[in-house]
């Protein structure tokens, strides 16, 4: 990957991330409150659906930029060593590495954002200060493991499926795809990936919102999933799946469509 491609991926990824996170923030708030242990209405219901948006705004650009720079760089490195049949494996590896890097930026902003969403009467700044006072800087990374373990399976489904759908559409029309077509493929791939990984998203939300020192806050994903299963059953494991699928399908359309458009413009 040369400098021009690097810059294009950086800017396109950052712009795409900002577009999605700010446009669809209310759906994300509703999803978080549906998944919280205290329940939807106690967590704020439909009140203050933009609570936590400053945290999302700060983290969106660098988070998405870090993902796509890593994703495109990894694809570029392995492109000369793999055949067409092995392309999905390259996409899976690239997406996994991208998520590991991006989560270093995403998790602290996600922790603050979700705690503010679940406590809309408290400002983002106050939530940040409280988190630092109670748990220190390390507390901002609570849920890093659960976030990575949610994002990697998600990306293992979304990005190979996105690339596959684009390739099929490209072959059928015998030429280059428009950005809106890449966006449609992104919406379909994102919706499928969002639904199948909802239980992991529920576990991540419980871990991030748990009080410091509790067993849930320890970050043991299998234990948290069992706790959700025992207390709420299958509906609990898929709590928030409808807004999550809606959010990520629309997000996939905007995110991947905007990414393709901006990147092609810069190249």
UniProtKB/Swiss-Prot annotation:
Keywords: Antiport, Membrane, Mitochondrion, Mitochondrion inner membrane, Repeat, S-adenosyl-L-methionine, Transmembrane, Transmembrane helix, Transport. It catalyses: S-adenosyl-L-homocysteine(out) + S-adenosyl-L-methionine(in) = S-adenosyl-L-homocysteine(in) + S-adenosyl-L-methionine(out). It is a multi-pass membrane protein. InterPro entries: Mitochondrial_sb/sol_carrier (IPR018108), Mt_carrier_dom_sf (IPR023395). The keyword Acetylation does not apply. Solcar repeats lie at residues 4-77, 86-168, 177-265. PANTHER family: S-ADENOSYLMETHIONINE MITOCHONDRIAL CARRIER PROTEIN (PTHR45667). It is found in: Mitochondrion inner membrane. One of its GO terms (cellular component) is mitochondrial inner membrane. The keyword Iron-sulfur does not apply. Mitochondrial S-adenosyl-L-methionine/S-adenosyl-L-homocysteine antiporter. Mediates the exchange of cytosolic S-adenosyl-L-methionine, the predominant methyl-group donor for macromolecule methylation processes, for mitochondrial S-adenosylhomocysteine(SAH), a by-product of methylation reactions. This is Mitochondrial S-adenosylmethionine carrier protein. The gene is slc25a26. The chain crosses the membrane at residues 5-25, 49-69, 85-105, 142-162, 182-202, 238-258. Belongs to the mitochondrial carrier (TC 2.A.29) family. Its main location: mitochondrion. One of its GO terms (biological process) is S-adenosyl-L-methionine transport. One of its GO terms (molecular function) is S-adenosyl-L-methionine transmembrane transporter activity. It holds the Pfam family Mito_carr. It comes from the Eukaryota. Gene3D superfamilies: Mitochondrial carrier domain.
